[in-house]
Amino acid sequence: MAVESRHASEPAVLDAAWLRELCLEHGADDVGFVSIDDPSMVDERPYALEVMPGTKTLIGMVRRTNRDNIRSRARSVGNAEIFNTGHDIDETNDAIVKELDALGIRAANPSTAFPMELPRYGAPRVWGLQHKTVAVAAGLGHMGIHRNVIHPRFGNFIILSTVLTEARVDEYSKPIDYNPCLGCNLCVAVCPVGAIKVDAEFDFLACYQHNYRQHMSGFREWVQRIAESDDGDDYPNHFGEAQTAAMYQNLASKPIDYLSGYCLSVCPAGEDVIGPFLHDRKQHVREIVKPLQQREEVIYVSEGSSAEAHLRKRFPHKRPSYVTNTPRLDFDLVETSPAPPAPEDAA
């Protein structure tokens, strides 16, 4: 491992094998390295430099999740798994940064998920780095049809994270030369709002309105409903008891409540995952896919939308609930706006 002084004019150049072992020792299940000058990082560069000026290398990592927790029909189990694994990999990142810092090497670890830069709410990105983009460039997998990264071994049962460092690495990673996605389209079949399509673009709005209901969009509507209520007795006419309880839970415990995520649950890709699917596809569908399709639940959609039409046609036993204030906000989220200025360009 080559290490230079913190005050040297040129940053350290680290041995890739040493850095990889460091990350694995602290809990990462796989790791790859990307230069900030890599063409694939052109959109991430300003966000990386906003987090830490002088960034030279992005360290992409994955941590495995428990597959059966993610597959559970009890969404509280899947949500707890996502939160707990995210917490674990944040601790991994922190330990790596501290060890590099002890060696005189600057490093920073943006959060895996929350907290985000929510004062930017309404801009296209309230998070810092796009961990998916880094992971693909770092050789940790490719995006499947469901827009999640599929690791060649662990499948989509992973949480992604990124560490930034001023050091360069003597050997950078490359994207893998194949996509682990099987094209089985089980994610298409299980999505209650029809957001995932074989022959069309991903419907961001449909996914966001339902899956992220307990996040900012639902919270904003909840506040509006409180303001519109005449008094406590009138409040249940505007926001149901079950909705209130769900909002309370998301605020009081872990800000990670997703209402669906079924696309992750049913995905059979990945060397460690695919065996049972290849052995008996019908059993995979019967035990994992069908229970999620048959689950009776409320699905949040815009009235008259393609998501509502899909829901009523494919899942008539699931009940639509109309969202009233999110379309404007959601479209704002996907509009383009300037990225944060690079430090050298900032006034």
What feature does the model see in each segment?
Residues 1-87, 91:
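Non-catalytic, usually N-terminal nucleic-acid engagement modules in DNA/RNA processing proteins
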Residues 17, 21, 25, 102, ...:
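Polar/charged alpha-helical tracts
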Residues 42, 84-271, 275-288:
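Catalytic cores of enzyme domains
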Residues 51-52, 128, 219, 291, ...:
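Short alpha-helix boundary/capping motifs
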Residues 123, 280-281, 285-292, 297, ...:
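Compact disulfide-stabilized, cysteine-rich extracellular microdomains and processed peptide cores
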Residues 286-288, 292, 301-310:
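Short, C-terminally biased terminal segments at protein or domain edges
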Residues 303-343:
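Long, compositionally biased charged/polar accessory segments in the mid-to-C-terminal portions
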